[in-house]
Swiss-Prot record:
It catalyses: (6R)-5,10-methylene-5,6,7,8-tetrahydrofolate + NADP(+) = (6R)-5,10-methenyltetrahydrofolate + NADPH; (6R)-5,10-methenyltetrahydrofolate + H2O = (6R)-10-formyltetrahydrofolate + H(+). Homodimer. This is Bifunctional protein FolD 1. It comes from the Bacteria. It comes from Geobacter metallireducens (strain ATCC 53774 / DSM 7210 / GS-15). InterPro entries: Aminoacid_DH-like_N_sf (IPR046346), NAD(P)-bd_dom_sf (IPR036291), THF_DH/CycHdrlase (IPR000672), THF_DH/CycHdrlase_cat_dom (IPR020630), THF_DH/CycHdrlase_CS (IPR020867), THF_DH/CycHdrlase_NAD-bd_dom (IPR020631).
Length: 290
């Protein structure tokens, strides 16, 4: 069993981005600029946002955090987004999710200019990604692809089972791995927590790669996978004792794995790295550098 070290991979990707940014600065261009909007106080969101801003510094970017109280109205937040959309010095915009209940999340996602939507959630980017066209790919799914690529895990022609159908992870990773592009051409089965148990077991036990994102601690157990499987655990769950665990029963499942991601230290780092890649792409688009 070997670990798919997201920290090591992310640091390599961000260092490569920093070298490119240094070259652009030497030619007289400004730094890439990411803006993150955080509404209200939500401990996990605070942690995610801090890691994004820190990674901006490591990549040579400018990172701006805009905080708003959870009393902000949807109309007020939309107005803030329109202002950032019109700002030529901001390349990428993230609105940290989740949002307060009185704000329609999809309205906010749809309001972000597609050319600044580095999360890859806007329908325009999601549609282009689905069609295999150039787009900002959803960051967690893109990060998983980059992790597989970094460790040279074969994907072409492999049987991949995705557990979880969210628009953030499950759906985009199933599309990306089945598309004909640099890390794809797998045969993908998309399952979820409503998939009948026996059907789920039938699929996972035949899978070469299992990717799970359901938010249930220890959901994937040793009996669900075959020898030599590659397991990607997207889950981040905090237990009552404060311990952070994934959706995989790590200590038992790892016995059968050829490769497995740890939690923490796996996919989370790759999500942030993918946001840096998308921000660089937005910046390059703005200056016609690609």
């Amino acid at each position: 069993m070997k670990l798919l070290d997201g920290k090591k991979c992310a640091e390599s990707l961000v260092a490569d981005i920093a070298r490119k940014v240094a070259g652009y600065e030497e030619s007289g261009l400004r730094k890439p600029h990411m803006t993150v909007i955080l509404v209200g106080e939500h401990a996990p969101s605070e942690s995610y946002v801090k890691s994004k801003i820190k990674s901006c510094g490591n990549a040579g970017f400018e990172g701006t955090l805009l905080r708003f109280p959870d009393t902000i109205t949807e109309a007020e937040l939309l107005e803030k987004i329109r202002g950032i959309n019109a700002d030529p010095t901001t390349d990428g915009l993230i609105v940290q999710l989740p949002l307060p209940r009185h704000i329609n999340q999809q309205h906010i996602i749809n309001a972000i200019a597609p050319e600044k939507d580095i999360d890859g959630f806007h329908p325009t980017n999601f549609g282009r990604m689905t069609l295999g066209q150039k787009a900002f790919r959803p960051a967690t799914a893109y990060g998983i692809c980059k992790l597989l690529q970094f460790y040279e895990i074969p994907v072409w022609g492999k049987h991949c089972v995705v557990i979880g159908r969210s628009n953030i992870v499950g759906k985009p990773i199933s599309i990306m791995l089945s598309n004909d592009f640099d890390i794809g051409n797998a045969t993908v089965t998309l399952t979820h927590i409503e998939t009948p148990r026996e059907l789920l077991l039938d699929e996972t036990r035949r899978a070469d790669i299992v990717i799970v994102a359901v938010g249930i601690p220890g959901f994937v157990t040793e009996d669900m996978v075959k020898e030599g499987v590659v397991v990607i655990d997207v889950g981040i769950n905090r237990l009552e004792d404060g311990k952070i665990v994934g959706d995989v029963d790590f200590e038992n499942v790892k016995k059968k794995c050829s490769w497995i991601t740890p939690v923490p230290g796996g996919v989370g780092r790759m999500t942030v790295a993918a946001l840096m890649i998308n921000t660089l792409m937005a910046y390059q688009n703005n200056f016609d550098l690609v």
